[in-house]
């Protein structure tokens, strides 16, 4: 993918001039843009650092080479920024959204999220996108003038990829698009699909590294087999790690190029000229009709052969029990919570407990579980 070193923003890209601003007004930064400020605040946040020790597919301590939420997030941000540049979109906004998209994830990945949602079913539920928003709006505790990071509207909007209708009704302008059917910015749409490209391909890589899936199994999936053959045609005799890496690299590049071409065509067909046109129209960032079923087949393969592999399911079952046990213990006796969460629990005990658990890393959650439940653990 060859693009210019710098591009002017397209007329339909979000710019500072059309931004809806921050909840708490601030003086403009002197040597950087407003969306750069958002990106920098996210990178320096506590929640961002914790992603290093949160699960992508494999529990953090299972292997040093497997991706964590942090390495996944960095890969998504890199891909998002490259795609944004190719399309003339706001790179800083797109990157900020990508960097923040998983800040609200629980320990133990989707298993932890599902377990915490089950615990919270009578208290408003738990949605990791909403928790990411809650993190940047309230939970980060760094600035004297406000809670959270005080990010621009467009960054916060992009973080909120999914939202149930009851929760959207509580979010005012930020939740309006889930009620009236309008679209987020192209930068937000782009970060969403860059996430999909990254995790689909990199889970292939990690799955092969782990030995839970094999090249022979993956050859049943057209999109993988096609790129593997192309790589081996170019480099006869290539095998092992280099074959896997080159095949995954080829798949990522092809999907990115497909996304760019289809999105450009969609923008042209829709006659989009402004950010308002983007919001009022159909979803524009998309794959081609030929790639969509092939990507679905790859995701289906990963679900059945990696995510549902018995060794992964054993980990996720243990994770659900840890989350459930912690939630139950803290609900029964909130005095077991750290002091700052005891204070919050006085006004909303379930949500304070959910905030505490969601902020844990995999290792911290396991350690906290041992402290509370393991015989002989007293500290």
Swiss-Prot record:
Record SMART domains: HDc (SM00471)
Biological-process GO terms, alphabetical: dGTP catabolic process
Coiled-coil positions: none
CDD domains in alphabetical order: HDc
Family membership: Belongs to the dGTPase family. Type 2 subfamily.
Entries under HAMAP family matching the protein: dGTPase_type2 (MF_01212)
Key words, A-Z: Hydrolase
InterPro entries the UniProt entry points to: dGTPase, dGTPase-like, dNTPase_2, HD/PDEase_dom, HD_domain, PHydrolase_assoc_dom
PANTHER family: DEOXYGUANOSINETRIPHOSPHATE TRIPHOSPHOHYDROLASE-LIKE PROTEIN, DEOXYNUCLEOSIDE TRIPHOSPHATE TRIPHOSPHOHYDROLASE
Keyword Hydrolase: yes
One function term, GO molecular function aspect: dGTPase activity
Protein name as annotated: Deoxyguanosinetriphosphate triphosphohydrolase-like protein
Lineage: Bacteria, Pseudomonadati, Pseudomonadota, Betaproteobacteria, Rhodocyclales
Domain of life the protein comes from: Bacteria
Gene3D superfamilies the record matches: Hypothetical protein af1432
